Amino acid sequence: AKIPGEEMEKKILEAAQELFLEKGYMATSTVDIAKKVGCNQALVHYYFRTKQNLFKQIYLQYVNSLMQLGRQNIQQCASVTELVQEIIHLYFTFFTKYPKVPYFFVNELIVSSEHRQMVKECFIDNQMRIMLFNQLTQLIRNDIQAGKIREINPYALLQNMVSLVLSSFLALP
């Protein structure tokens, strides 16, 4: 039975995601992906052109999922304390839902300069992330001026929070 185009594209994406999470990007070939789907390699290339495009689309799905998960709750935070709690909760919720993703993110950042550039384009330059970071920065300024917290670099605070949460998941067996 012939599978419709959109469904085939989805199956290829799901197979690639599963294999990338299981084996990593470098150890996964488009042949592996095609075998898992039950199609030929040409079909994988037809829909995505390159393995890198597949990787980018999967990475973007995770970034967008993470951003959407926190969008409403984070925007409602009125203080740095509330925002810190919400960001930590957001990452714990996300990584609990997708337990292999921390390894995937970290491994690909370490292994590939190409992927580091892609992360910059997909995550660092993400408009939702920029908006949330600006909100964090404004809340920090407000709380510093009100004498509630000491002077702190917003980027350092965010990096420390995410690193601590991420390390909790990377330490799991």
Give the residues covered by each predicted segment:
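Short, basic, alpha-helical segments at the C-terminal edge of helix-turn-helix-like DNA-binding modules
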Residues: L60-S65
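Helix-turn-helix
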Residues: K11, A15, L19-N53, Q57-I58
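Hydrophobic alpha-helical bundle segments that form small-molecule/ligand-binding pockets
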Residues: R129-L158
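N-terminal intrinsically disordered/low-complexity leader segments
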Residues: A1-E7, E14
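Conserved hydrophobic residue
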Residues: Y25-M26, H115, I149
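Short, flexible, glycine-rich and Lys/Arg-enriched loop motifs at helix boundaries
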Residues: V165-P173
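Hydrophobic alpha-helical connector segments
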Residues: Q72-Y103, P154-M161
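Short secondary-structure transition hinges
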Residues: F92-Q135, A156
